[in-house]
Amino acid sequence: MRTVCYGKRERLTFGRIHDAVKVPNLISIQIDSYKDFLENGLIEVLKKFSPITSQPHKGDLKKGEKGFVLEFVSTKVGQPNAPVEECKQKGLTYTVPVYTTVRITDVNTGEMREEEAFLGSIPHMTENGTFIINGAERVIVSQLVRAPGVYFVDEIPKTQVVSPIYVAHFLPVRGAWLELLYYSADNMFYARIDRKRRINLFLLFKALGFTDDLEILDLFPDPIDADDEYTMEKAVGSIILHDVVLDGKKIVERGGVLTKAASQAILESKIATVVRAHPAAQKTLEKMVDTYGEVDSSKAYVEIFRKLKPGEIPRVNTAKAYLTSLYFSTERFELSDVGRYKINKRLTQAYRRYLAQVKGLPEEEVESVEYNPEDPVLTPMDIVLASRYLLDVSKNPEIMDTKDHLGNKRVRTVGELIKLEFERAFARAQRLIQERLTLYASLDKISIQSLINVKTIIAGINQFFATSPLSQFMEQVNPLAELTHKRRLTAVGPGGLKRERARFEVRDVHHSHYGRMCPIETPEGANIGLITSLAVYANIDKFGFLTTPYRKVVNGVVTSEIVYLTADEEEHYNIAPCTIKIDKDGRILDERVPVRFMERLQFVEKNKVQFMDVSTKQIVSVSTSLIPFLEHDDANRALMGSNMQRQAVPLVKPEAPFVATGVEYDAALYSGYVVQAKYSGRVKKVDSRKIVIERMDENGKPVLKNGKPVLDEYRLMKFMRTNQDTTVNQRPIVDIGDIVKAGDVIADGPATDMGELALGKNVLVAFMPWEGYNFEDAILVSEELLEEDTFTSIHIEVYETQARDTRLGPEEITVDIPNVSKEALRNLDENGIVRVGAYVGPQDILVGKVTPKGEGETTPEEKIIRSVFGERGKDVKDTSLRLPHGTDGRVIDVKVFDKDEETDLGAGVNKLVKVYVACRKTLEVGDKLAGRHGNKGVVSKILPKEDMPFLPDGTPVQLVLSPLGVPSRMNVGQILETHLGWLAKLTRNWFATPVFDGAKENEILPWLYEERRAVGLEEGDSDNEPSGKVVLRDGRTGESFAEPIVVGYIYMMKLVHIAKDKIHARSTGPYSLIHQQPLGGKAQFGGQRFGEMEVWALEAHGAAHTLNEMLTIKSDDIKGRNEVYKAILKGKNIPEPGIPESFRVLIKELRGLALDIRVYDENGNEIDIDRV
């Protein structure tokens, strides 16, 4: 066991393996991608549209025709429009202006001019990897999509189940698909163009320029054994590709058909092999000739066009242009760098075989040849190689592609997604540029800025940020939730999968996920397996493929060289886990070692190992790597543990876990909520709002500038609100005089303690039943936790109101509110806005506001009253901002934005007031608590601490958990954590137990027993077989319980599902406009729906009158409910209910369908439904 320093805290670690690689920057996936977009992506898009040429100016022909060419040279990014905090407060978008240098040339004169033009302001990423859009913090989630390229798969035909169809799919980034098909049952080749009808493959070959039939057959040679009688007999009728010479005489010429006699002669001779055309190729050619006769390229084009567009008249030029535009022109078809790279990689093996078999090159010469055309479109050779490779696939289906392999998927990160959007927006602007260029006659009259339509570009990008499913409102419950959101991968969204159609195989864990995507962290429900998280060390290469690091192993010795491999590259190597035994020089000690090879696990000799994992936490995500003893938890519960840590509310007094994994420090660091020193120095001044550090050099001497010491000031965030209404509050953890190094943590943020992530509290728990109060995972809680404010959290809500211009005059924010008591105005200042520090409850006025009502002519008397009493005399409506039902708290901040001072408040808004109310929420019955192992429960009872079970030394336990929550859930990690947590408390140590390399039971229990014995707490346990159990006594009676009980410290978190936020009651409230039924939901102050099943319940009990009331006067009988109200006020009997409004709505809807609906009473008299 060794001591490791995590931030400002030292921990004893049980980890035996030293990580070969430090945890990388966990949000670099966002930051690097966006940076690349600004530096390279912008100019790449502009260069794609460059040059833009004008149409010739149709002027006086004598003066010569004018033409201009516009090119984009470079781009430049300006400074952000406002600080991040200001954008959040004022509801602005945090943007940067983008400029481009444009070169415009007059084609006739060669005259040239360069000018800088403004392209628009685009949302800019903050240093934490987020965007501020209209004041709200958002994240662009990375998308996992099928990589373009060529895929070899099999399809089972609908007609027969016996022989599959082998398909080569060419998948572009943009453009039509091309599918080459080999029907093994018919032994025929076909092609399917743009997912339409299939055509003969060789028809496509003819169009591609293979004019001679024999030339096509040459591409599919099939050497056969000339000594084998059976083979030669079957080969009769085959077309021979090479002359067969016997005793200087040609028996069969090239292109001839092998006869029975020739076959017999060859058998009797010493000829070893005969090269014939592959039967599938011969049959395909014969079928083409049978169907179309002699085919040249023109005829091929026409026939293909006829199949693809049956309604149109086929002309050679049209047909040729159409096919060329589909696959061989960059205008309508694009493979992209990734697609070309994937095709080249996939077809290299086929290319080598082509060179050897068709071109006759020697094997050793071919082995090192790579297939590397650089065309952004398909080439004839791609199609030839793919169709040849189909024959190999049919013989060896193992070499087929699986769609779910990560080598066939790539990640579209922020930069690429914005680049695609920018490209779409600029394509629209480009057409306008072209049109506007034609309007100018000379170069000096052209204003480049006026050519570019900035609005089109900005609108496109803003729409993406505001409405795309990949632009998401950031989860900010705690720092981990934010970090995980930035590292999320989604397979759904534009260009991705549909949630409803996603098969089980897509969602499942695949062996290629190892070290790239977490197999544990994914939502429960409809999105399971579609939304995942990046593994801790995963990286993204230049093509967007996920890579993971490995240590290179040479001759059984582990080197320090780190290699990043994609899922495809990894397939060819034996990779050992990092838990194998090695000595201090890196030599592997065991002769045979377990390794991963493709999807298999096998044992190999140590000198056959090529790579080794870099860390035990390599396969999991950040959230999952925070679970101690993960190796003892069932995957389903670990999934819940990972997800629930993201829902933990930051507490008033954060406390790091006694039992950690060592990742807490990195998670807190990259979440962006802790403050790091940028330079080394000495702390000069500290208070709650700022830290001042005097900068020092390596020798410890102050750094001077103009003879004065350089001071670095770090401002802290105090009680800021997050997207989910939790609190961000930073606290300094350094003192005056402390020496700090660059990179040290100097201030904690929310849910961090001494630089480590601290999502919950260490509490003393006992696993035992207690009077049924822990039935169904409920939790019994000691009042001590309330007294100590253990699980108290602060939540900040913002309430805002606008004073707008209305048709009847402007709204006014004022303290003069009609019909309101002085008591209700006690917390408002002279402007009608609540004062900071006031305690407010439900329905209290936060901002007084009046709206003008419609009014007729005013009499002279009214004018006098107005002049005397001011606004009070005016006919106005009270539209004040009030605190909603069920909330209370203290006003901690008020922000007022006035139209005169602010330019961007929006049209018709004169004033905007935001009131921030902080609410302190202590633990209550109904709150949800959870550990890190998926062990969740609801507080069922809060018991006085004197009634709680207590230890032999009198210490009462703080939580009582159900022991039945462990065996069937198979999350035994919580029991080991309980033991180690108690050991931490007794020894005053902080422990780290890394995932898959943690403490063993025999390391904890004997040590725990020794420590307990030292303080007299060994009762209930024995020396020879320590169990970690202790005798507890009942707090109410003082008697000991029958059996010893597992007691210890567990790290528990309070989740964001707080009972106080969910509880809701309605007396009288709003009704829906059309149906006149009460609204639903807490937000609308709605009622509880009395649904179908509830009606059945009342029917079953014969409660007819109650049911009648429920469906009429308590719901949508307008007249009836008003009458009942009057009757109750006057103390009269309740009248009979009338007709529900929903019945009238139904009749009106049926009449809207042109049905004549009439209502009659029991005597057959027609009733006018509108008058009843």
From Swiss-Prot:
One GO MF term attached to the UniProt entry: DNA binding
SUPFAM superfamilies hit by this protein: beta and beta-prime subunits of DNA dependent RNA-polymerase
GO CC annotation terms, alphabetical: DNA-directed RNA polymerase complex
Top EC group: transferase
InterPro entries named in the record: DNA-dir_RNA_pol_bsu_ext_1_sf (IPR042107), DNA-dir_RNA_pol_bsu_external_1 (IPR019462), DNA-dir_RNA_pol_su2 (IPR015712), DNA-dir_RNAP_su2_dom (IPR007120), DNA-dir_RNAP_su2_hyb_sf (IPR037033), RNA_pol_bsu_bac (IPR010243), RNA_pol_bsu_CS (IPR007121), RNA_pol_bsu_protrusion (IPR007644)
Keywords: DNA-directed RNA polymerase, Nucleotidyltransferase, Transcription, Transferase
EC number(s) on file: 2.7.7.6
Source organism superkingdom: Bacteria
Record GO biological process: DNA-templated transcription
Nucleotidyltransferase as UniProt keyword: yes
Catalytic activity of the protein: RNA(n) + a ribonucleoside 5'-triphosphate = RNA(n+1) + diphosphate
Family to which the UniProt record says this protein belongs: Belongs to the RNA polymerase beta chain family.
HAMAP family, per the entry: RNApol_bact_RpoB
Function of the molecule: DNA-dependent RNA polymerase catalyzes the transcription of DNA into RNA using the four ribonucleoside triphosphates as substrates.
Matching PANTHER family: DNA-DIRECTED RNA POLYMERASE I SUBUNIT 2
Assembly with partners or alone: The RNAP catalytic core consists of 2 alpha, 1 beta, 1 beta' and 1 omega subunit. When a sigma factor is associated with the core the holoenzyme is formed, which can initiate transcription.
Official protein name in the record: DNA-directed RNA polymerase subunit beta
